[in-house]
Amino acid sequence: MEEFQGYLELYRSQQHDFLYPLIFREYIYALAHDRGLNRSVLLDNVGYDKKSSLLIIKRLISRMYQQNHFLISVNDSNQNKFFGYNKNLYSQIISEGFAVIVEIPFSLRLVSSLKETETVKSYNLRSIHSIFPFFEDKFPHLNYASDVLIPYPIHLEILVQTLRYCVKDPPSLHLLRLFLHEYYNWNTLITPKKSIFAKSNQRLFLLLYNSYVCEYESILLFLRNQSNHLRLTSSGILFERIRFYEKIKYPVEEVFANDFPATLWFFKDPFIQYVRYQGKSILASKDTPLLMNKWKYYLVHFWQCHFYVWSQPGRIHINQLSKHSFDFLGYLSSIRPNISVVRSQLLENSFLMDNAMKKLDTLFPIIPMIGSLAKVKFCNTSGHPISKSSWADSSDSDIIDRFVRIGGNLSHYYSGSSKKKSLYRIKYILRLSCVKTLARKHKSTVRTFLKRLGPKLLDEFFTEEEQIFSLLFPRTSSTLKRFYRGRIWYLDILCINDLVNHE
């Protein structure tokens, strides 16, 4: 236990730069104006209102302590004015300003960690596609994987209590509770479809949710990284971090005797790999299904005891990678054997050897994509292209540009697909839907419109990469064929845009 305590103290000592300064210090507002701090490290919030200046935010926060100005009529809640703003805008200003200020220690910690590790071109690590080279390197050596959906906390107070581990400023937490209690139904349950995660307050609640996920991962990954030090000494899992050292001084069994119906024991699994994007994570291991089941029930008890979140064990499925695919970031990924025949010669005798290797196979999800296209009226549920009637009033160039942009984004994102045939089918649907939309606008048939426009329209749908390679190499060359069959991962994809309403 003494050795384990040393590792815990080392881990907690690295959290000191994560403490949150007082919210009412003047220099905090000056730091928020540092565009190099927020834009080079953190993603810009697209929905951030430029009218919400930090000076207004500071004045509004100060006036919130004057209760006679904070009372709002129930019958006239939407029309009540405060400093010239209605309630909704007032709520948005406070939430955006609070999120901007609390983001500062997060960004400072990220900058310092990148400097300590001497990470070169750290912006490449922010790309979604950077996860798949990790899959290609690690997952062929693993046997089992489990899809884990991180459950949402059922109450806003859980998010506030989670934030207190990194925000050591009680007045700001009380301010956050007051704000959430006033502007949102404090007693309602949180679900992903609730208006609490609407775009108008996206920045604040993404910050709260990310702090909740960060707390969950910090404990999970710490115990996973230190598992090799616990091989000979069984130790109960430490959940509460506020009474950390008190629990280390006394026997673990006494501390947790009244908290849990059964003692949870940590186990050694150095081959576990963990990957997450947003609320979905993949837990993969090289060991037996028994250890994977232990991880599953550990997560269920962890969420229930630490975050008071109920999760059903039956919803966490453990699959063998060689027999099942897993859906992650829009790709259907699986591990497939790659058998190659090698001719070997020993003196005068030659013989053939089968060299079997495993590789990651990433497939384009054709059926879900057709369903998405049908939902936004590009085709029917069978995959037959139809005209986009809502775009028929736009100009020809605008219609073509929209279709080309969607097709280019899909080609760019799914460039890592092992088989491009399904992707070409989706591009064909978009091309024909574009032609039908233009023909409907000009009250003509598709055949007549294609004859009049010629093949130039279809050339617009070629991506920039395809155009460059078609100029450098002939169509029949093996280089171009390898390009169409090969996988390309781009390091400039930071988010997944909406299929239609994208910029």
From Swiss-Prot:
Tagged with keyword Chloroplast: yes
Keyword set includes Plastid: yes
Family to which this protein belongs: Belongs to the intron maturase 2 family. MatK subfamily.
Name this protein carries in UniProt: Maturase K
Function: Usually encoded in the trnK tRNA gene intron. Probably assists in splicing its own and other chloroplast group II introns.
InterPro entries per record: Domain_X (IPR024937), Maturase_MatK (IPR002866), Maturase_MatK_N (IPR024942)
GO terms of biological process kind: mRNA processing; RNA splicing; tRNA processing
A Pfam short name: MatK_N
Record-level Gene Ontology MF annotations: RNA binding
Entry keyword set: Chloroplast, mRNA processing, Plastid, RNA-binding, tRNA processing
GO cellular component entries: chloroplast
Principal location listed in the UniProt entry: plastid
Gene (name only): matK
Source superkingdom: Eukaryota
Subcellular location(s) of the protein: Plastid, Chloroplast
